[in-house]
A protein has these predicted regions:
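Glycine-/acidic-rich phosphate or pyrophosphate-binding loops and their flanking alpha/beta elements
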Residues: 17-28, 37-82
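Conserved thiamine diphosphate
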Residues: 1-25
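Short beta-strand segments
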Residues: 8-10, 32-34, 72
C-alpha cells in the first residue's frame, strides 16, 4: 500500500508523540501497541505534556549515543538492547 507507515513506540514519550503524529498524518499509519508494555513505568519528561509535543514519523531515536556499534530494535526489545 503506497504511503503506509508503521510506528512501534517504546515508552510513554514515544506513544504520545507518535500517536499525535499518526493522527495528523495524511497517509495511513499502523500503530503497533505492545500489551506486554502495559504497567511498565518510565521516567516522564514534562515536555511531553505540551499540547504540541510530536515525534516526527520516519526519524530514528537515539536512546544511548555511542561510537562503536549500532543496535536497532523496536518496542520491548529496546529495553533489552540497552
Amino acid at each position: 500500500m503506497p504511503g503506509l507507515k508503521v510506528v512501534s513506540p517504546w515508552n510513554i514519550e514515544d506513544c504520545r508523540g507518535l500517536l499525535k503524529a499518526s493522527i495528523r498524518d495524511n497517509d495511513p499509519v499502523v500503530f503497533l501497541e505492545n500489551e506486554m508494555m502495559y504497567g511498565i513505568e518510565f521516567d516522564v519528561d514534562p515536555k511531553i505534556m505540551d499540547k504540541e509535543f510530536l515525534i516526527p514519523i520516519g526519524k530514528a531515536k537515539i536512546e544511548r549515543p555511542g561510537t562503536d556499534v549500532t543496535i536497532t530494535a523496536h518496542a520491548k526489545m529496546v529495553g533489552h538492547s540497552l
